[in-house]
Amino acid sequence: MDLDQKLSTGELRVDGDMTIYRANEVAQTLFASVRAHAGDVNLDLSDVTEFDTAGLQLVLMARRMVESNGHRLDVVRPSECVAEVLELCNVAVTTEPTQAAA
């Protein structure tokens, strides 16, 4: 899993797998990045290739961390596998790319 950080603009881009098999690795990197940024976060998951409920839990935990500081985390440009899990679990954490950029 790679995490491209553009924290000056509040954008984090994750690629690769976000599954139970990589949950610890993803969590450490993602949460450290979220803690380092004191503002709204756009989490770009367009290059995520596998996503399961462990990945969903990581996204929800990251969102809770950001919201506890009075800010917002949005998933932008979810890949197909991410969108499928979000829809299946009836979870709304996405924002249209045009809304996220505004």
Annotate each predicted stretch with a short phrase:
Residues 1-51, 60-102:
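STAS-like cytosolic regulatory interaction modules
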